Each structure stands twice: as structure tokens, then as C-alpha cells.
């Protein structure tokens, strides 16, 4: 259910784009992300850092898109967000000795420290590659194809990555 909740602004962006175009879709994404943060704050009293970062990036890049009437800003937004996640994972691990993937998933999984480090690095690399893929699509395909990639391509890549990661992790999980 959380996965669908996380996709909420992207799905609304997609629908608004198909009906009204990129600029209305951008405004819808900003409002949807604000609503998402407000709901999480109301419901749980604590908003994850990743959601705050997502809100900041959509407000800045979405706002620039609307103010300057230039869709390139919203098209760059996923790349900036993915690269910030990648940098955050790597900086936390190597500058502050904190493994953010372990912090997020450590209550659900018991893994050796080197495995957590590999998992953290895998997620950082995955986000870096997604950022590059987004730029490739932005510069080589139509706006409509980019919107389809943003919803279906990145979501599909995420699902495949999680499945492959889960298969890899099974050899480290103890029978309980």
C-alpha cells in the first residue's frame, strides 16, 4: 500500500499530463506532493527525510517550470532527486559511517554488516543509473514518451531491482 501511496503524485502527474499537458501536470504534482507530506505529517507526526527531499525538489524544479514556462526543469527533476538519493546514501555511509538502507530496513531484516554495505551501494548505483536513464530519455525522446518512461519505465525498473535484490538476499537470510 505504501508503494501506491508513494506513486500518488506520479500517477496524478501522468493523468494530468494526458488531459491538460505538462504545465498543469507540474502544478498537480506539486499540490499532490504537498498533500502527501501533509497527510503523512497529520497521520504519523513524522515525515521521512526522503519525502521532504522529494517535496523540496518538486517545489524548486516544478516551480521553475511554471514560472519560466520551460518543461526542461520538471524533466530534470527525477535525475536531481535520484542523484541526491545516491549521494545521500554514499555520503551517509562513507562520511558519517551510517548505512541508511540498514537504518530503513534493519528492523525487518537481519544481515551481516558487509551485506548491508553492498545493499547500500547497490541502491546508490541504482539511483545514479536511473538519473542517467532519465536524462537519456529527456534528450532523445518526445515529452510524451518521457512521461510514460517516468511512470512505467522507472517504476518497472524499481520493481525488477527489488525482485533481483530480494532473490540475492535470500542466501543471507536465516531460517526462522
Swiss-Prot record:
The UniProt entry, under InterPro entries, shows: YciB
Q: What is its main location?
A: membrane
> From which domain of life does this come?
Bacteria
Record's keyword terms, sorted = Cell inner membrane, Cell membrane, Membrane, Transmembrane, Transmembrane helix
User: Where found in the cell?
Assistant: Cell inner membrane
Keyword Transmembrane helix found: yes
The answer to whether the entry has keyword Transmembrane is: yes
Q: Name one GO cellular component term.
A: plasma membrane
Q: How is this protein situated with respect to the membrane?
A: Multi-pass membrane protein
**Transmembrane annotation, as ranges:** 3-23, 24-44, 49-69, 72-92, 121-141, 149-169
Q: Name any one Pfam family assigned in the record.
A: IspA
Which family does this protein fall into? Belongs to the YciB family.
Q: What role does this protein play?
A: Plays a role in cell envelope biogenesis, maintenance of cell envelope integrity and membrane homeostasis.
Q: What is this protein called?
A: Inner membrane-spanning protein YciB
Please name the source species.
Burkholderia cenocepacia (strain ATCC BAA-245 / DSM 16553 / LMG 16656 / NCTC 13227 / J2315 / CF5610)
Classification from the root reads: Bacteria, Pseudomonadati, Pseudomonadota, Betaproteobacteria, Burkholderiales
Gene name, Swiss-Prot/TrEMBL: yciB
Amino acid at each position: 500500500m505504501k508503494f501506491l501511496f508513494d506513486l500518488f503524485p506520479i500517477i496524478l502527474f501522468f493523468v494530468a499530463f494526458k488531459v491538460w499537458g505538462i504545465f498543469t501536470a507540474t502544478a498537480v504534482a506539486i499540490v499532490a506532493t504537498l498533500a502527501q507530506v501533509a497527510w503523512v505529517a497529520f497521520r504519523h507526526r513524522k515525515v521521512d527525510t526522503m519525502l521532504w527531499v522529494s517535496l523540496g525538489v518538486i517545489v524548486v524544479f516544478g516551480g521553475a517550470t511554471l514560472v519560466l514556462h520551460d518543461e526542461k526543469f520538471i524533466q530534470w527533476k527525477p535525475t536531481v532527486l535520484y542523484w541526491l538519493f545516491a549521494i545521500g546514501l554514499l555520503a551517509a555511509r562513507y562520511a558519517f559511517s551510517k548505512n541508511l538502507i540498514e537504518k530503513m530496513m534493519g528492523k525487518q531484516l537481519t544481515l551481516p554488516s558487509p551485506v548491508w554495505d553492498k545493499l547500500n551501494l547497490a541502491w546508490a548505483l541504482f539511483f545514479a543509473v536511473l538519473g542517467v536513464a532519465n536524462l537519456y530519455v529527456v534528450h532523445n525522446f518526445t515529452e510524451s514518451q518521457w512521461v510514460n518512461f517516468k511512470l512505467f519505465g522507472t517504476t518497472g525498473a524499481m520493481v525488477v531491482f527489488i525482485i533481483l535484490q530480494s532473490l540475492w538476499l535470500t542466501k543471507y537470510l536465516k531460517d526462522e
